[in-house]
């Protein structure tokens, strides 16, 4: 299918605008978060107060590593590679447990272990960041560490049914409060499974390791068999260890994010049967999110036990742009492209923080007003979702269909 003239023009404008947002706003904000002591400052509150002595999350640093490495690959600005190297050194020297293996959850502002929990989710993001850094500079040490983390995940976290998630410093199984919500004591989550797929996709792309490929295929199969709910065209969120669903939660942002990440995983894996299966699954999910969660301007957050949460979350809008643009490229359905452009329009008008020194508002009311209830930067607020949105849109081929 060929683009119509309006959509082609809209895509060109979209690419120009996200490039400008990336270069003139997102990158400069995160440049200022660099800590000369090592790594990046661990928190800025929603009123833009920098907390220089806040603890530093390993997830934050893995995502920052991914961001600067990927931005360098796109923009070829050598200064971005130095920011990536700064994040890499901190992740390697301070967040990695050389005695027991794996990444800590967080360290102090000076780089000493703070929350020494080992979480499968955390290890996955470290692999993701390390792979991007290897792509950017060819550092074999980074790729070796990524492979070591893969082996650690496989040897330490797997049970009969899949991957357990939360462990002590010495890899004793503990409660999974960090990735559970709504009072549900989840032993397995869609979220961690999705980001294992994301990480293993990149590691397999680089190494073509049979072991990594086999586990990536298994993760895609278990997602289709156990996590995907074909009756409602959605992903279940929380589970016990045997994949029995806990609660009734529908995460709109994770669903639309999953569509493009799983499409990418299938592309990299090259399994024709899985690719065909996921074409149907991901198109169904995208259609459902468009029908249920998109109100014409923005995406709702989630539904829990039948109660809608209409909060406008920064990462949900960003993943919506990427997910719907991918859905358009895969199907040729111009409605998906229109939705992606509408979400970007909302982001420009409301989600981007226009205050001097701000980045993106984390949370907005349904009326588009900032809630100032969540970090401007912190353990979960980083340039991964919005920065990646810019980079993915920038590289989307205008003739992708």
Please annotate each region the language model reported.
Residues 1-401:
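Glycan-recognition and catalytic cores of secretory/periplasmic carbohydrate-active enzymes
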């Amino acid at each position: 299918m060929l683009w119509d003239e309006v959509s082609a023009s809209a895509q060109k404008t979209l690419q120009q605008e996200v490039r400008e947002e990336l270069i003139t706003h997102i990158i400069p904000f995160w440049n200022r978060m660099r800590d000369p002591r090592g790594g990046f400052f661990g928190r800025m509150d929603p009123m833009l107060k920098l907390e220089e002595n806040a603890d530093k999350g390993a997830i934050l640093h893995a995502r920052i590593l991914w961001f600067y490495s990927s931005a360098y690959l796109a923009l070829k600005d050598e200064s971005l590679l130095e920011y990536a190297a700064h994040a890499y050194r901190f992740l390697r020297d301070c967040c990695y447990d050389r005695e027991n293996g794996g990444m800590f959850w967080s360290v102090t502002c000076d780089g000493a272990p703070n929350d020494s929990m080992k979480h499968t989710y955390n290890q996955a993001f470290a692999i993701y960041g390390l792979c991007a850094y290897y792509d950017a500079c060819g550092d074999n040490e980074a790729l070796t560490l990524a492979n070591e983390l893969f082996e650690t995940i496989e040897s330490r976290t797997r049970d009969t049914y899949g991957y357990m998630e939360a462990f002590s410093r010495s890899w004793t199984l503990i409660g999974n409060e960090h990735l559970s919500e709504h009072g549900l004591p989840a032993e397995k989550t869609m979220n961690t499974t999705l980001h294992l797929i994301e990480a293993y996709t990149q590691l397999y792309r680089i190494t073509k390791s049979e072991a990594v490929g086999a586990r990536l295929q298994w993760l895609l199969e278990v997602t289709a068999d156990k996590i995907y709910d074909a009756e409602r065209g959605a992903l279940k969120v929380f589970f016990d260890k045997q994949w029995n669903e806990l609660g009734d939660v529908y995460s709109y942002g994770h669903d639309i994010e999953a569509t493009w990440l799983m499409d990418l995983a299938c592309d990299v894996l090259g399994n024709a049967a899985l690719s065909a299966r996921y074409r149907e699954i991901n198109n169904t999910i995208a259609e459902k999110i468009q029908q249920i969660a998109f109100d014409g301007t923005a995406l709702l957050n989630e539904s829990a036990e039948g109660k809608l949460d209409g909060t406008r979350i920064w990462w949900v809008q960003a993943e919506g742009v990427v997910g719907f643009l991918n859905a358009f490229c895969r199907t040729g359905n111009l409605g998906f492209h229109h939705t992606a452009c509408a979400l970007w329009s909302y982001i420009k008008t409301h989600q981007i923080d226009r205050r001097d020194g701000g980045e993106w508002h984390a949370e907005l009311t349904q009326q588009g007003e900032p809630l100032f209830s969540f970090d401007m930067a912190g353990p979960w607020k980083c340039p991964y979702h919005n920065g990646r949105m810019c980079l993915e849109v920038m590289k989307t081929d205008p003739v992708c269909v």
